[in-house]
Amino acid sequence: MYSRKSLSLISKCGQLSRLNAQAALQARRHLSIHEYRSAQLLREYGIGTPEGFPAFTPEEAFEAAKKLNTNKLVIKAQALTGGRGKGHFDTGYKSGVHMIESPQQAEDVAKEMLNHNLITKQTGIAGKPVSAVYIVKRVDTKHEAYLSILMDRQTKKPMIIASSQGGMNIEEVAERTPDAIKKFSIETSKGLSPQMAKDVAKSLGFSPDAQDEAAKAVSNLYKIFMERDATQVEINPLSEIEHDPTHKIMCTDAKFGFDDNASFRQEKIYSWRDLSQEDPDEVKAKKYDLNFVKLKGNIGCLVNGAGLAMATMDVIKLNGGDPANFLDCGGGATPETIKQGFELILSNKNVDAIFVNIFGGIVRCDYVALGLVEAARELEVRVPIVARLQGTKVEEGRDIINKSGVKIYSFDELDPAAKKVVELTQN
């Protein structure tokens, strides 16, 4: 739901426990949009952003820079990852953010960026594909602040986090000078009052001349958060600008997240989705109506129920193992969903074993057992499978497994099953 930075910041502000922060990360189900789309949305709400244009070819980059009619330009690779400036491309070309001074430079840099993968600390070694660049005018900043809006899970209310120290790693600010971080809790029934917007603006450290526009920007950012079903609005930096005739305050970098559950009423926003930026297995899982998040371990997990899935991963860790994924097949575990889940798990070449943990309430364990046996045969599974089944029709389920001739280690209890799957991966 939130970026790692925001979750860490909330935790340091005493709003979320570490456990809740991890759970929120593992349940990430939101849309992120490219920077040029974020700027488009901000402008629709009357919020200042540096003038700029996206480009999808080197020739378009040349024309975009020409249209801006200045030698003070920035070109940014459009990839949904942090740390673009410190990243590098799969060709060895350095940095996803470059200062440029001419249309020809824009074209030359775009050639290096477009249709290549940008690799940062957040992407892993594969990187993220770059199919667009964003060319913007450089602005002269007088002061940089930080502002984010998100839901506080503790109070169940929207919360604004503000700091007069922006344009840097906000986590470091929270550690070094926690008093520099201000929090404002908003009653959803009342909304953001003009007075609170002014209080937030005042906390950002802008000059008196810029206070009114800053308060208006805060109000409009909150409108975006509420009207567009956002899960996160993060502006870093929110800048006071010098020598600009149109705006004293500008969002010079923005990050948004939008709630997937509201996609049906945010069709325009969701038309901006870039599937090339998402993990293909997670995209496939969504089509299957499975909740899947890839992790870094070697034990594939298939479980029904998010809470049981979290507990299963905990038990694996407690026994010295490392989960390769979070996979909740929900209350509709069927032979088909079992097979789809196995396909997702086995697409990860790091998986050395599969752990199936099913509690049969609505779900019948004999159906699950049939699915396990069919999936193991059809997919020619070569890694060990450990299955812990409990609940409705469990005896019939165990009987199906035992008579199948397929090598599946069947258990009644969770802890012995977890120990077995860890043992199998270690041997």
Swiss-Prot record:
Binds 1 Mg(2+) ion per subunit. Disulfide bonds: none annotated. Mg(2+) binds at residues 236, 253. SUPFAM superfamilies: Glutathione synthetase ATP-binding domain-like, Succinyl-CoA synthetase domains. Gene3D superfamilies: ATP-grasp fold, A domain, ATP-grasp fold, B domain, Succinyl-CoA synthetase domains. Residues 1-30 form a transit peptide. Substrate binds at residues 304, 361-363. ATP binds at residues 76, 83-85, 144. Succinyl-CoA synthetase functions in the citric acid cycle (TCA), coupling the hydrolysis of succinyl-CoA to the synthesis of ATP and thus represents the only step of substrate-level phosphorylation in the TCA. The beta subunit provides nucleotide specificity of the enzyme and binds the substrate succinate, while the binding sites for coenzyme A and phosphate are found in the alpha subunit. Heterodimer of an alpha and a beta subunit. This is Succinate--CoA ligase [ADP-forming] subunit beta, mitochondrial. It comes from Saccharomyces cerevisiae (strain ATCC 204508 / S288c). The gene is LSC2.
